[in-house]
């Protein structure tokens, strides 16, 4: 269908978001046009502010507005454990259960040989650097139960084993192919409690 150029551009912009197809992008574009000028300005302002003000924590790699982030600077956290996740959304999911009190490391991606993504393409070197001369005695791998998540998990385990650091993996309460960010709190709690050593 032929839309006026401004609407077509808006549809194109929305369709670049993950999980947004052409129909949803069209609905969002038309809804945005129907919003009040004040709401559209607030939306645009918030979007620009988030893009401008957010950065990655120089310690853990989590998306934050403070560097280092609030978790890395919290002295009450257990500094002997680091939970490794794919992205910042996974940290939020784990924090919701209010059970894990250790630190995090965000990989900002997964090793994916099929997509040409290797260990050097994700935030892995900084994890290894963090572990040198630290009090960490356990690294808990909490990547998603996908082929790329498993490949990443096995790689991290192989790299860290010679250093004598205990490497564990979340227990299988998470269905294969599922994302941590969508798991319910009870499933995540059981996965942490029943983690297995690699």
Swiss-Prot record:
Record-stated family: Belongs to the RecR family.
Task performed by this protein: May play a role in DNA repair. It seems to be involved in an RecBC-independent recombinational process of DNA repair. It may act with RecF and RecO.
One term of GO molecular function: zinc ion binding
The name this protein goes by in its record: Recombination protein RecR
One GO-annotated biological process of the protein: DNA repair
Species of provenance: Streptococcus thermophilus (strain ATCC BAA-491 / LMD-9)
Coiled coil, from the record: none
This protein's record includes keyword Zinc: yes
Renumbered zinc finger spans (C4-type): 57-72
Database matches in CDD domains: TOPRIM_recR (cd01025)
Protein keywords: DNA damage, DNA recombination, DNA repair, Metal-binding, Zinc, Zinc-finger
Domain of life: Bacteria
Domain Toprim: 80-175
The keyword Zinc-finger is assigned to this record: yes
């Amino acid at each position: 269908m032929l839309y006026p150029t401004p609407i077509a551009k808006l549809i194109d912009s929305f369709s670049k978001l993950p999980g947004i197809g052409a129909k949803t992008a069209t609905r969002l574009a038309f809804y945005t046009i129907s919003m009040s000028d004040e709401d559209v300005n607030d939306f645009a302002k918030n979007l620009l502010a988030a893009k401008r003000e957010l950065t990655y924590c120089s310690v853990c790699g989590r998306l934050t507005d403070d560097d280092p982030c609030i978790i890395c600077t919290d002295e009450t956290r257990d500094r002997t454990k680091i939970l490794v996740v794919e992205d910042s959304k996974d940290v939020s999911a784990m924090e919701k259960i209010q059970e894990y009190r250790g630190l995090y490391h965000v990989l900002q991606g997964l090793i994916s040989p099929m997509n040409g993504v290797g260990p050097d393409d994700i935030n892995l070197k900084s994890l290894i650097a963090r572990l040198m001369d630290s009090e960490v005695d356990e690294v808990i791998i909490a990547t998603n139960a996908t082929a790329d998540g498993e490949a990443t998990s096995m790689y991290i385990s192989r790299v860290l084993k010679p250093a004598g650091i205990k490497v564990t993996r979340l227990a299988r309460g998470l269905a294969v192919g599922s994302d941590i960010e969508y798991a319910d709190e009870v499933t995540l709690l059981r996965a942490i409690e029943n983690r297995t050593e690699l």
